Curated annotation (Swiss-Prot):
InterPro entries cross-referenced by the UniProt entry: TrmE/GcvT_dom1 (IPR027266), YgfZ/GcvT (IPR045179), YgfZ/GcvT_CS (IPR017703)
Signal peptide residue numbers: none
Source species of the chain: Saccharomyces cerevisiae (strain ATCC 204508 / S288c)
Listed name of the protein: Iron-sulfur cluster assembly factor IBA57, mitochondrial
GO biological process, one term: protein maturation
């Protein structure tokens, strides 16, 4: 194997991206491996064609300013006139879970109205950076509720100076919410110099990709940091960002022009830092001509064989729920949840706390500042999940801390009625639910769990049991799984916030 102590793939810089090569590289077909095989393949490539994805193309000189006022991410830097050699301190997580201090180097001032320059990201290894890869963000309504999450792709992945005079992006949305977002864009357009259009769903394809190296030693750093995640967060201008994207596109996809957008998953970075074998996920947007993404992937750039698996979209959803992540309004009801309840504050550059005004900002900023948040999304496992299929209340089903239905009703103190001679009666009140099941795919799902139950669910030697009671009186056991951000939450908030 090619693995060194730090598993560094040589030659990976902004100017020259060269993955470790070998003339003996082998390719493993999509056929299932022999069950009797003792060793795992050195590389695993899982991919899936996602359904019901629709895109809005938006472009024009005011595009960045316009989107910056609508989404939760900071897309437009607030420039402060100062010496660009001035640096500030920036704490970033390390593999050991501690922090190191890196200098903050600001992005030099530029005209965001001109050129297809990419996306501004507020926080990176050395402060803000410019990227040509997608950004996970969200649209909120005026009350701060989530209309939909979205991925904003600079498109195409790479550009030459003469291609476009203005910024251009693709907004990835589920088909059931695209018309609502078109209405939001139209309502706020006013005099902004932008153009946007819904792209026919048959014109583009959306692929989920997961690349894993299962045989890596446990005591080394996950190679995706040295080779992709860290260097992609370094460019301070559009030229370096484009050069890096050119190298990545060439190395992984042989510069195939049918690749129109790439999103590098960063929401699970903390898991990647703790586990060297944790897979790196991507979202890839292609033209409709692509029938099999694995045929575009450049396996020859790696020095080991790969097992290639085409997954069904439901399998991708199961894996996503195991990580405690939602993805599009397929997983939740629009305008019913707060972004912080969905842990968007734990995702890099998904929510900005200092960008200023945007739709839904007031409640989001106040909640973040006070730290008072009573529920958060966690992964869960369900027993007898089949019972949910026939339950009309399966969306956002309440679950309680006890499996006995009668115990969900607590008795109030007896109340004396002054207008009757009858003795005082005890009334029953419904116990507050411990949480809500947001969505599931078979055994796995995601649920809002009240933070007051976190200690019992994740830190107790004898975890409590939670149950959903269906309309037929049947019980479904629901077991919360410790989320990847739990340690950070516990350190910052304590067990009862």
């Amino acid at each position: 194997m090619f693995i060194s102590r730090r598993c560094r793939i040589k030659g990976f810089t902004l100017k020259n991206l060269l993955w470790f090569r070998s003339s003996s590289t082998r390719f493993v077909s999509t056929e299932s491996p022999d069950a009797s095989a003792i060793t795992k393949p050195d590389g695993i490539f899982n991919y899936s064609l996602l359904e019901n994805r629709t895109y809005i193309r938006i472009r024009g000189p005011d595009t960045v300013k316009f989107l910056n006022g609508l989404v939760t991410s900071k897309l437009l830097p607030h420039f402060i006139k100062k010496n660009l050699t001035t640096v500030e301190e920036n704490e970033v997580p390390t593999e050991e879970g501690t922090t190191k201090v890196d200098p903050i180097i600001p992005v030099p001032e530029f005209d965001a109205r001109l050129g297809n320059w990419g996306l501004y990201n507020e926080k990176g290894i050395q402060g803000p950076y410019i990227s040509r890869f997608g950004l996970y963000s969200a649209f909120l309504n005026g009350k701060g509720k989530l209309i939909t999450d979205t991925i904003i792709y600079p498109t195409p992945v790479t550009v030459s100076e003469q291609i476009s005079n203005y910024p251009e992006y693709l907004l990835e949305l589920h088909g059931n919410v695209v018309d609502k977002i078109l209405h939001v864009l139209q309502t706020h357009k006013l005099a902004n110099k932008i153009k946007f259009e819904k792209i026919d769903h048959s014109s583009l394809k959306t692929w989920d990709v997961e690349v894993q190296f299962p045989n890596l030693p446990k005591d080394i750093e996950n190679p995706w940091f040295d080779n992709l995640l860290d260097p992609m967060a370094l460019p301070k201008n559009s030229i370096d960002a484009n050069n890096f994207a050119v190298n990545v596109l060439n190395s992984l996809f042989n510069s195939d022009p049918r690749i129109l957008g790439i999103y590098v998953e960063r929401r699970t970075e903390s898991m990647s830092r703790h586990y060297s074998t944790f897979p790196q996920s991507f979202r890839v947007v292609t033209s409709e001509q692509v029938d099999d993404l694995s045929k575009l992937f450049n396996f020859n750039v790696f020095d080991f064989p790969f097992q290639v698996n085409k997954k069904a979209s439901v399998q991708v959803r199961e894996i996503r729920f195991q990580k405690g992540l939602i993805d599009s309004t397929e997983d939740y009801i629009s305008e019913t949840l707060l972004p912080l309840e969905l842990n968007f504050d734990f995702f890099p550059n998904t929510i900005s706390t200092n960008k200023g005004c945007y739709v839904g900002q007031e409640l989001t900023a106040r909640t973040y500042a006070t730290g008072i948040l009573r529920k958060r999304l966690v992964p869960v496992k369900l027993d007898n999940y089949q019972l949910l299929d026939t339950d009309p209340e399966r969306k956002y089903a309440e679950f309680h801390i006890d499996n006995v239905v009668e115990k969900s009703l607590a008795e109030n103190e007896p109340t004396l009625n002054p207008f009757t001679n009858k003795p005082p009666e005890r009334t029953k009140r419904k116990q507050r639910p411990a949480g809500l099941l947001i969505s599931n795919e078979g055994l796995y799902g995601v649920a809002l769990l009240r933070t007051e139950h976190f200690s019992a669910a994740f830190s107790s030697d004898e975890p409590v049991e939670f149950y959903i009671t269906t309309t037929k009186g049947e019980n479904i056991k629901i077991t919360p799984q410790k989320p990847f951000w739990f340690s950070d939450w516990k350190n910052n908030n304590g067990p009862h916030k």
